């Protein structure tokens, strides 16, 4: 039996300027998908997401953290890459989303079409921008036991994910997170500030919940046609109601548990469709042994996506069937 193929979609913190640049220039399917969604977004917010992503005055290292651009940009990149793989005959047996990546997973699985999902993302960005104070997220490369060992240091933050045994993420007010970062660096503990302007998955975005819930009540969602394994629950979802699309960015992320669930069912192959390859890196830490042979990413900040795309042919099997 073939190893089931899992498409993974990451969320806020994985984005950067010029992501997917090679594909946008060289791949017709990717570019067409990006431009179609860009036109939809421009009608809603009055400006081009694509022009912001590929702004000639921006460097990859510049923070791409304006939610009105970054929220839709992540979805557009991930869904457009899915269309490229679909065009090559590479289809998923499962989709796995993490945080904002749950929206792309839902679109790919047929819960909603891409245009409607993009509308949900844009509305969420607008409401959060109008309702919430700014915040930050910090990735820490150490054991989560650190939180218990130094309770005073982490008192003004919220644990939002444990991605593997020595990698966890916290959210909080910007001043508090920056102070934690300084203290960790003094202790020679590696950490990285994520390129976000809001403290996703924490109580700091609660002021946006009511307005977004009201918006979601006008939407309808279908049963997934491809199994969804969610980082919200750490398991397989069979039905997605409107509350899911708020909880996906508010509740803690359980990506580690989602991977463990999949691996308890099958020996899987994984393709990271996010812009940074972050989820692929996590999988390689979570799965012992041959994980490097079972997991790959395509788009990375090193702009080798055309080369990486060719290697993904290894994941295509003629026997795999795909139905909607």
From Swiss-Prot:
Name of the top EC class for this enzyme: transferase
Pfam families: Acyl_transf_1
Keywords from the named record: Acyltransferase, Antibiotic biosynthesis, Cytoplasm, Transferase
Cellular component aspect of the GO annotation: cytoplasm
Catalytic residues (positions): 99
This protein's pathway: Antibiotic biosynthesis; bacillaene biosynthesis
SMART domains, A to Z: PKS_AT
Annotated localization: Cytoplasm
Principal localisation: cytoplasm
Keyword Oxidoreductase included in the entry's annotation: no
Annotated EC: 2.3.1.-
Molecular-function GO terms, alphabetical: acyltransferase activity
The organism's place on the tree of life at top rank: Bacteria
Classification via InterPro entries: Ac_transferase_dom_sf, Acyl_transferase_dom, Acyl_Trfase/lysoPLipase, Malonyl_transacylase_ACP-bd, Polyketide_Synthase
GO biological process: antibiotic biosynthetic process
Summary of the function given for this chain in its UniProt record: Probably involved in some intermediate steps for the synthesis of the antibiotic polyketide bacillaene which is involved in secondary metabolism.
Name by which UniProt lists this protein: Polyketide biosynthesis acyltransferase homolog PksD
């Amino acid at each position: 039996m073939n190893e089931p193929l899992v498409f993974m979609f990451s969320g806020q913190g994985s984005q950067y300027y010029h992501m997917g640049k090679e594909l946008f220039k060289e791949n017709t399917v990717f570019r067409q998908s990006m431009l179609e969604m860009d036109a939809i977004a421009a009608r809603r917010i009055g400006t081009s997401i694509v022009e912001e992503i590929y702004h000639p005055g921006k460097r990859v290292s510049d923070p791409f953290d304006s939610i009105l651009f970054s929220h839709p940009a992540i979805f557009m990149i991930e869904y457009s890459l899915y269309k490229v793989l679909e065009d090559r005959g590479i289809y998923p047996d499962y989709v796995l989303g993490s945080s904002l990546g749950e929206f792309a997973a839902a679109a790919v699985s047929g819960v909603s079409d891409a245009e409607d999902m993009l509308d949900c993302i844009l509305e969420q960005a607008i409401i959060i921008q109008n309702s919430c104070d700014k915040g930050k997220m910090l990735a820490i490369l150490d054991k989560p036991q650190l939180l218990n060992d130094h309770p005073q240091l982490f008192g003004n933050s919220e644990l939002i994910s444990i991605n593997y045994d020595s990698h966890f993420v916290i959210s909080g007010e910007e001043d508090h997170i920056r102070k934690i970062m300084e203290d960790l660096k003094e202790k020679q503990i590696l950490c990285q500030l994520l390129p976000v302007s809001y403290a996703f998955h924490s109580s700091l975005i609660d002021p946006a919940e009511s307005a977004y819930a009201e918006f979601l009540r006008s939407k309808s969602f279908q049963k997934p046609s491809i199994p969804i394994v969610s980082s919200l629950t750490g398991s397989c979802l069979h039905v997605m109601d409107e509350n899911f699309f708020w909880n996906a960015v508010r509740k803690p992320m359980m990506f580690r548990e989602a991977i463990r669930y999949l691996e308890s069912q099958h020996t899987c192959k994984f393709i990271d469709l996010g812009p940074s390859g972050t989820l692929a890196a996590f999988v390689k830490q979570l799965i012992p042994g041959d994980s490097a042979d079972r997991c790959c990413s395509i788009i990375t900040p090193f702009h080798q996506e055309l080369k990486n795309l060719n290697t993904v042919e290894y994941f295509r099997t003629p026997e795999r069937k795909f139905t909607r």
